[in-house]
Structure formats: C-alpha cells, structure tokens
Amino acid sequence: MKVTVLVGGVGGARFLLGVQQLFGLGQFRAQRHTHGRPDTAAGSHELTAIVNIGDDAWIHGLRVCPDLDTCMYTLGGGVDPERGWGHRDETWHAKEELARYGVQPDWFGLGDRDIGTHLVRTQMLNAGYPLTQITAALCDRWQPGARLLPVSDDRCETHVVITDPDDGSRRAIHFQEWWVRYRAQVPTHSFAFVGAEKAAATTETIAAIADADVILIAPSNPVVSVGAILAVPGVRGALRAAGAPIVGYSPIIGGKPLRGMADACLSVIGVESTAEAVGRHYGARRGTGILDCWLVSQDDHADIEGVAVRAVPLMMTDPAATAEMVSAGLQLAGVTP
C-alpha cells in the first residue's frame, strides 16, 4: 500500500511515527509480527511524506529547513526527545561564540550537530542540486524509513504582516521571526507565501499524490504547515484529482491546538479554533475543498457537508496511540492496510 502524508514539523513527525508503527515501517519493522513471525507484508508498504518548506530560512549563511529536519531526525531516531526538534545530545558552542561577536539574529540558535546538516545542504544547493535530491542524500545518513519530499524545490517561504512593536509601522517579517522571536505575540494582520507565484510542486510530489492508495493530512498547523503546502501551485489541484481517499486529522482538541500556536494562526485568517471550523476551512472534495474524511476528538463535533466525520481519541501520546488514530482514519475511508 502506498501512503502519502502531508506534514509539518514536530506534530507531523510524531504522526508519521504512528503511521510507521501501524504498517511496520522504519524503526517499527522488527516489532510487527503475525502469529509470532515477522510480517513480511510490511515490505510491501511505502510511506511518503510531503513536507512543508514555508518555515525554511537562511540563518548565518546556512539554509535551514526545520520541518524536513524534524521529520528526518525523528524518524531516524536522533531527535531531542524533550524538545521534539533538533539533535539529541546537542551542544551550543557555535551559538555562544556567535553571541560573543554580536552576530544577528541572536533569537535563532543553531546547535553544533545541527549545523552539520545545514552545511551539507547549503554546499549542495550552491553546487546546483535541487532540495529534493539533497533531502534524499541527507536521509541516506538517517534512514528514516520513509521518503521525505519537500513539497517544492522552489522558494515558497511564509512571511507574516505585523505591526512593529517598536515603531508601530506595518511590515512583513519571516515566519521564523514571528514564531521564535515574538512567539506570535504581536499584532498580526495576514500571512503571505513569498515565492508562491513562481513556485511549483515537484514532479515527485505530484506523483506521490497521484499514485497513493490513501492520502492523510496530519494534525499539523492548518495555516502555516498544511496551508503553506497547499499554497504551492499544483498541490491543491493534484489532491482534488487524486483517486485515493483523503483523510484529515483535526489539530484542535476541545478548542485548543494539539500543540504549537495554531489558534493564533487561525485567528489571523478568521477561522475559529474548533475542529469543525478547521474541517470547513479545508472543505469537502465534493465541493471545492480537499477532504473526504475528517477525524475529530471524542469531545468535539463536526458537521461538514460532503465529508465523513468520526470522533476518536486524537492525543498522540505515543506511536501506538497515534497508530490507532491512523487506523481509525483508514477504516472511515474504507481502506484496509
């Protein structure tokens, strides 16, 4: 079975672990058994993640791709378990030395181990390699047990229009500055996907959607993760034309985001922080949207015309619990693993 998942960073990576556990992929391959024997059918499953690139930025001359790296480190077993991003056993000597020089930005730190990833990526970009090939090369080191695809090889960065807290002017800043420096706590007016007008989804991304047996939308931020993926020309059309069912998972539980600041992002675009509102924001494929099925928390409700809805536990407490979420979505879509 070919499974394609649209994901952001930390939450998306944890969701992918659940998919892997359900299908016996990646680090869970040896754990899946049938009648006491290894399940050889696990080898027939293929997992592809289409990953947000809207967070990507140039930091200290290095190309940083936070969501791609978080997925790669998480699935490869090297992520910091406390933060949910970055390297395990990270050190920060380079960051400390840059601070002594007064180098800006001082609000975004790169770990010493993490810098190795960014150096390789930047060197390959300078040599003319596209991001898709670079990501595949980086994954050779991490062996994530899934194909990680940047949605595009082109620049398509999320910027945020704010009121500057210092002088009151209205200006656009990179999403990383809004998220990391200001913690989304400044007057915010809109989001813009810079470069989208010239960007295009990669052929690999379009093929992963067209060839899938089921397409899952992880409970990632619907505005700056999934929304940024959908902003890349070609993606929405490919989803609407896909032969596979599309199953989405609500990032909102009981009116609060599963993690991160999705509620702040939704407020900016005028969408309520409810499972139903986010489902309506994505919309039904029978209409002009992208959903066939929508999973919400047991404590939530959603009535969306043209979309099959089911309430199940959505807390990703561990890969096993997440695998149950994934399984429930497949059942709702009528897909048998």
UniProtKB/Swiss-Prot annotation:
Keywords recorded for this protein, A-Z: Magnesium, Transferase
UniProt entry tagged with the keyword Transferase: yes
Binding locations of 7,8-didemethyl-8-hydroxy-5-deazariboflavin: 69
Lineage top rank: taxon: Bacteria
Pathway(s) the chain acts in: Cofactor biosynthesis; coenzyme F420 biosynthesis
Keyword Transferase: yes
Biological processes, Gene Ontology terms: F420-0 metabolic process
CC cofactor: Mg(2+)
Matches recorded under HAMAP family: CofD
NCBIfam families: F420_cofD
Name by which UniProt lists this protein: Phosphoenolpyruvate transferase
Chain's gene name: fbiA
